[in-house]
Regions:
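Conserved CoA-thioester-binding segment of acyl-CoA-metabolizing enzymes
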Residues: 1-71, 108
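Amphipathic alpha-helical repeat scaffolds
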Residues: 41-45, 122, 439
Length: 719
């Protein structure tokens, strides 16, 4: 492409120049980069927004410009959205509204240009980045693996407020816009095409020439944008009765369960409904008001805090080390198969080994079903699906280990079996720099590594079930585990799309250690005569994704009993297992895996385990009155805070931030609180201490708060 003397600003850090880099080619097409060469991430800071406004004024005043192409500063990066620190810093609704107006006004300059504007999207195009693209006249998306397109703002407790909510309704229609905005969806390119967000998906290597030819075609056609026709469903919703029916249905859904605790989806729904029929400026004004209202809510502040926790965790993936290219997983059960499939789905050539041929066949079928589902949803194309399946080999034999960089066992929770397998891996030629990982959930990593020729290479990589869906990975450091092994585990977790939290080797690690008293107390409340539906509903209304009775059924009473046994042995006297666990195991009412536990196999109604519950209730003398909702929350949630404080004092977790992330991503603690300690500080640590003291007096001494919690409850001025 030949360039003529256009306007260019000197390269540098955003804010050093009054504009962004742009150039003009001989066909009169201006090429505007949203950042400077070498920038790996483009966020919309105040300085960048000012630079964009200045540059668009400059381009608009240049009579040589016939069309404009907007793109990122390099491959694999368009724009990741607004700087979240700006969202965090908004102190009033008026300040939020002013920021929304300023952002939308800047982006609107793209639409106001007299020439066609094409967005050439490759890499992340999220939040404010997509809002910018929606003001362009045509959107091309690269099919590169890095391309992600979406409006995730509701996950921060707000809505797209730079015009994105309104523009998406006008572009794609109400049903599609609601699907994206209310769920904060992030889409792959083909999904974005199907949703009507982008106009065309093109091969990555052809993005620039096709952006150029598209711009020229619009110039030659003498129009800014192509003619578009909304889908029939969207056109029908232009009629008030149809909109009313849709709105009623969605409002009812948003009033139920944890969704009712989040104001952003409800407010976004109202803005979308208005945008479907109201004049454009009125809809923009309502979007602005909504952003101002939402950005200062406690829910938004809590969700933003969790966002920063996840970003800190992802930075652990940048620690020094080599990315794993080849792995072996030993153990073809549910966890081993799930982990192997996860590895294969993220570019790692994986051999899954088990003596049970049927287990290996099931593992292949499970991964194939998952891949086929992703193809149907257009999150994966058929060629990529074949590559995933090709990366997973299954065998009853280990074969050569010479190229294996990560060896992971997910076999039965028997320390001697794990030790024998690890020793065999070393003796069979596992490379000296390879990592030996255990997925144990109840055994000590130090004990597993005992007698292994190279214990410094042994690290716990504790996935939660199901591995493909659960976002947390506990990286467990034993006394002899090297930094290199920990770094490798963290890099792997981030590559798999997970959030690693490094914990010290201790019984139950962090999540199970904190969760055990919660589940044990739920079992105690159940045996006291409280109904499962009441207990579950109380915690659902608090914001948990599922109640404790259903969670016990999902985990399985056999697993709960094993974890409880380990923790009770480690903390004798303080932790005592509920008799319900052993009784359910004896009755084979293990939960969903056995056809039902407390609840039925479908998670509803009474399961076979309720006969066990009633028998145990009858054997308990006296009893307590039916608990109130407040008492249930105090007895379940406040001990969580106390146990977390104990973990911090013992060095199981390094910081409150690590605990917060682990509780949100590991047990589903309501993220709008900003994590467990976010909740505790909002509730008041002194109030929690007083609550536990009262429970210790009136219910049982087990509630007595720890010194670790009492110290944290003392105001800083009094320490």
């Amino acid at each position: 492409m030949t360039l003529v003397a256009g306007t260019t600003v000197r390269p540098g850090v955003p804010g050093e120049a009054r504009g962004l880099p742009w150039r003009l080619d001989t066909d009169g097409i201006a090429w505007l980069a949203l950042g400077h060469q070498g920038e790996s991430v483009v966020t919309l800071t105040l300085e960048r927004m000012e630079a964009l406004a200045d540059t668009l004024r400059e381009i608009g005043a240049d009579t040589r410009v016939r069309a404009l192409v907007v793109r990122g500063p390099g491959p694999a990066m368009f724009c990741a959205g607004a700087d979240i620190k700006l969202v965090q810093g908004v102190a009033s609704a008026a300040e939020g509204e002013a920021a929304a107006v300023a952002g939308r006004t800047t982006f609107a300059r793209l639409r106001e240009l007299a020439v066609p504007v094409v967005a050439a999207i490759e890499g992340p195009c999220l939040g404010g980045g997509l809002e910018l693209a929606l003001f362009c006249d045509f959107r091309l998306a690269s099919d590169a693996a890095s391309t992600r397109i979406g409006l995730p703002e509701v996950k921060l407790g707000i809505l797209p407020g730079f015009g994105g909510t309104v523009n998406l309704v006008r572009l794609a229609g109400l049903p599609r816009a609601l699907d994206v905005v209310l769920q904060g969806k992030v889409l792959r390119p083909l999904q974005a095409l199907k949703a009507g967000i982008v106009d065309r998906v093109v091969p990555a290597e052809r993005l620039e020439p096709l952006a150029r030819s598209t711009a020229l075609a619009l110039v030659q056609a003498g129009r800014k944008s192509p003619a578009r026709r909304l889908p029939l469903a969207a056109r029908l919703l232009a009629m008030a009765p149809a909109r009313w029916l849709l709105a009623r249905s969605i409002r009812n859904k948003l009033r139920r369960g944890p969704a009712r605790l989040y104001p952003a989806p409800r407010r976004a729904l109202e803005v979308c409904l208005l945008a479907a029929h109201a004049p454009l400026q009125r809809a923009f004004a309502e979007e602005t008001r909504a952003l101002g209202e939402l950005v200062v809510t406690p829910e938004s502040k809590g969700l933003v805090q969790v966002y920063f926790l996840t970003e800190a965790s992802r930075r652990l993936g940048k620690q020094p080390g080599t990315d794993v290219a080849r792995a072996m997983v030993v153990g073809g059960g549910v966890m081993g198969a799930g982990i192997a499939g996860l590895f294969a789905s993220h570019g790692i050539r994986t051999r899954l080994c088990d003596l049970d041929t049927a287990a290996l066949v099931r593992a292949r079928r499970t991964l194939q079903a998952d891949v086929d589902g992703r193809v149907r949803k257009k999150s994966l194309d058929r060629a990529a699906a074949r590559e995933v399946m090709d990366r997973l080999a299954v065998s009853t034999e280990w074969g050569s280990l010479r190229e294996t960089q990560l060896w992971l066992e997910a076999v039965v929770e028997d320390v001697h079996v794990k030790q024998r397998l690890m020793t065999a891996a070393v003796e069979r030629g596992l490379p000296r720099d390879a990592v030996l990982a255990t997925n144990t959930s109840s055994l000590s990593v130090d004990e597993v590594s005992e007698g292994i020729p190279c214990p410094e290479r042994v690290v716990g990589i504790h996935f939660f079930n199901p591995p493909a869906k659960m976002p947390l990975v506990e990286v467990v450091r034993g006394k002899r585990t090297s930094d290199a092994a920990v770094h490798a585990a963290c890099r792997l977790a981030v590559r798999l799309g997970k959030y690693p939290v490094v914990v010290r080797d201790a019984p139950g690690f962090l999540v199970n250690r904190c969760l055990a008293p919660y589940l044990n107390e739920a079992a105690t409340l159940l045996l006291e005569g409280n109904e499962p539906s009441f207990l579950d509903r109380t915690l659902l209304d608090f914001g948990m994704p599922m109640g404790p009775c259903r969670l016990l059924d999902e985990i399985g009473f056999d697993v709960a009993a094993k974890v409880s046994e380990v923790l009770c042995a480690a903390h004798p006297g303080r932790m005592v297992a509920s008799p319900l666990f052993a009784a359910m195991v004896e009755a084979r009412a293990l939960g969903r895996k056995s056809g039902g536990g407390i609840l039925g196999a479908d998670g509803k109604g009474a399961g076979p385990g309720m006969d066990v519950v009633r028998r145990l209730r009858a054997a308990i003398p006296g009893g307590r009155p039916q608990a109130t909702r407040t008492e249930v929350l105090r007895r379940l949630v406040h001990p969580l805070v106390d146990e977390a404080c104990r973990c911090l004092d013992e060095g199981v977790a390094a910081s409150e931030q690590d605990v917060d992330l682990a509780m949100v991503t590991g047990i589903g603690f309501p993220p709008f609180h900003g994590g467990l300690f976010g909740y505790a500080r909002r509730e008041g640590l002194q109030r929690i201490v007083a609550s536990l003291d009262e429970l210790a007096r009136d219910v049982h001494p087990r509630f007595s708060p720890s010194d670790a919690l009492r110290r944290r409850a003392v105001p800083a001025s009094g320490r």
